[in-house]
Amino acid sequence: MRVPYSWLREVVAAGAPDWDVAPAELEQTLIRIGHEVEEVIELGPVDGPLTVGRVTDIEELTGFKKPIRFCHVDVGDDVDREIVCGATNFVAGDLVVVALPGTTLPGGFAIAARKTYGRNSDGMICSAAELGLGADHSGILVLPPGTAEPGADGAAVLGLDDVIFHLAITPDRGYCMSLRGLAREIACAYDLEFVDPADVKPLPVDGQAWPLTVQPDTGVRRFALRPVTGIDPAAVSPWWLQRRLLLSGIRATSPAVDVTNYVMLELGHPMHAHDRNRISGGLGVRFARPGETVVTLDDIERKLEPVDVLIVDDAATAAIGGVMGAASTEVRADSTDVLLEAAVWDPAAVSRTQRRLHLPSEAARRYERGVDPAISVAALDRCAALLAGIAGGKVSEALTDWRGEPACDGWSPPAIQMPADLPDRLAGVIYPPGTAAKRLAQIGAAVTADGGTLTVVPPSWRPDLLQPADLVEEVLRLEGLEVIGSVLPSAPAGRGLSAAQRRRRAIGRSLAQSGYVEILPTPFLPAGVFDVWGLPDDDPRRGTTQVLNPLEADRPHLATTLLPALLEALVRNVSRGLVDVSLYALAQVVQPTAETRAVQFIPVDRRPTDAEIAVLDASLPRQPQHVAAVLTGLREQRGPWGPGRRAEAADAFEAVRVIARAAGVDVRLRAAQQLPWHPGRCAEVLVGDTPVGYAGQLHPAVVERAGLPRGTCALELDLDAIPLVATLPAPRISPFPAVFQDVSLVVAADVPAQAVADAVCEGAGDLLEDLQLFDVFTGPQLGEHRKSLTFALRFRAPDRTLTEDDATAARDAAVRRAAEAVGAELRT
């Protein structure tokens, strides 16, 4: 939020006329009471002759690729200045700001007389951006008639001695997105009297301004309307108002629109102006209907959803509530009668709609943070009086003031009871008696003391004050957090990492050492990802948990698998030229269960009971820890040693074994079919008899639909399904020599090599130290649908030197066990 210091000082000075602090001091004060000051911008500096001029004559130059104008400008001298200008948003008679030769504009831009486009240009007509007043380069700055006379000091007229505070307002402090809120904060910080600019004299009320109906459950808390008729369509906003809007980052357009923006900045209440003569029948507030569309003020037709809240008349949509007006009731250049609207919308509804439609606005930002419903009519009256004063016309005494629930006294949140010394006890600081009551009264709360207890009714603009802790925070920040001692809490002796944490770190290190790069995956699923994978409707991964207020409207579902985020990252990397990619992620997924219940509300002013904690646990979906990896491109790089090798399913299987070794468990792989993997190159991973995940090459159809490189491989394991091994056994080292033997076994072609290896290991017993498959052979001499697997066996005893007969006996036992388990025959 951009705030001109001169305007802020004026609002504060209404209650403290002598208040005047330097901008640098005010910056530190705002930071001290909890506000984030992103930047303090000093306007200018402009050195040299900057003056107000009046355009007396314009000659359009032709023969150039863009419009060029040769202007005569009266700058108060005896002779008009000749200036070449490329802007077209002004006419003869307009007041402009002229930088004469010798002027240096912000950014070090020096102005000199020069010949350009075949004419002599004796200065420059300036835009707001060139003067450092904003970012608008669309045309030169045209001053309203009567602002100044030609030859007047341009720097003084523009107020270039001002300072702009750029603040980052946190979501819980929406009241500070206004001069009213910030001035109150400053008054609290300096113990000044505060005069509320929202305390305006009410305008007369006689009858209803406009028929209005509001559909239930739309979340509207208040809706006020007042007409202003007979305004002059040729009127323009005065310079003082345009300047304040410009310095606040808003471009002036017309008086009706300008005054709504001005009151929004001043009081924090967004407003909207409708052309009264373009409204057909009564107004209504309702949800959008399926398939309904609206053309907004930017002339774009937008598709609406049934959750969008609209303002409608009998013929068309008049506005998207809290987001943007519709073209049907837009105030235009010939409008003479306007209907001013001040409404309070549901913050969640506004946030959801503006995100989905990509329509962020100053009004929507304020509605998202909460708007004070108590000042709707005051803001409406302030706006109407300003408009009538600027553009003429008559403010109607008719007023529509619809109030929803709750409409309690003052529109305030519920009262809160708090021990008067609670801030002292929580901060460890002894504050003077009455400090809590004083500070809470300063922020606008109604405070009643009864012994040692304060009953506090928060003000209507502070919906964030809900419990004693919130009140304590207000007292502490206004008293200054710097007075709280910096004492480190005494921590209990550390117990180190848990077994699960140690395992997680070991897995991450092992994958990194194997060439994988870790990513931090987003917890939300991309829209339609499971349709791209071709998952059936009853696949458990489709059973997702939906977030009510997602960061992105098109990603409201929490991830049940890590692969979508990894594959998105892989596509992004490949699109940027990184074709050999190996990524992994370690994170939780969210898997709803049939037993998941609604979350029970538990107060935060006490520790939950064991029963309440059990209910909370039961209401949560499963959140197991998963590890997943994806890889594509070359797994072994090309070089003098060879052409390199592309990643394949075997690399995904090896990554599974890397994870298993880090976790201290043995895994088995068996052929399986599971989307999005290729049915012939997918393995189910088992620990004991428990399935823990899948690995292999992705299905070609999925690869094509998802825009992935050909041959992309992936794996995903559920770490929570893998038992924890508290202490990994140390490797057994034998000082005795090993005996090496090979064995070739013939099995059916559809028997997995892993099944044969498992049988060999089981049959060979403890003497078998290592087994490696090093050859697979098929041929007519083996018979149809048969294959030969050759293993290298390494035998070693821990307590003696093995003989060849010992190793042969163990090998023969392994062959017998393989024959029993998978029908293997010894190849001779």
Curated annotation (Swiss-Prot):
GO terms for cellular component: phenylalanine-tRNA ligase complex. SMART domains: B3_4, B5, FDX-ACB. Its cofactor is Mg(2+). Residues 411-486 form the B5 domain. InterPro entries: aa-tRNA-synth_II/BPL/LPL, B3/B4_tRNA-bd, DNA-bd_dom_put_sf, Fdx_antiC-bd, Fdx_antiC-bd_sf, NA-bd_OB-fold, Phe-tRNA-ligase_IIc_bsu, Phe-tRNA-ligase_IIc_bsu_bact. Its main location: cytoplasm. Pfam families: B3_4, B5, FDX-ACB, tRNA_bind, tRNA_synthFbeta. GO terms for biological process: phenylalanyl-tRNA aminoacylation. Mg(2+) binds at residues 464, 470, 473-474. Its EC number is 6.1.1.20. CDD domains: PheRS_beta_core, tRNA_bind_bactPheRS. SUPFAM superfamilies: Anticodon-binding domain of PheRS (SSF54991), Class II aaRS and biotin synthetases (SSF55681), Nucleic acid-binding proteins (SSF50249), PheT/TilS domain (SSF56037), Putative DNA-binding domain (SSF46955). It is found in: Cytoplasm. GO terms for molecular function: ATP binding; magnesium ion binding; phenylalanine-tRNA ligase activity; tRNA binding. Tetramer of two alpha and two beta subunits. This is Phenylalanine--tRNA ligase beta subunit. It comes from Mycolicibacterium paratuberculosis (strain ATCC BAA-968 / K-10) (Mycobacterium paratuberculosis).
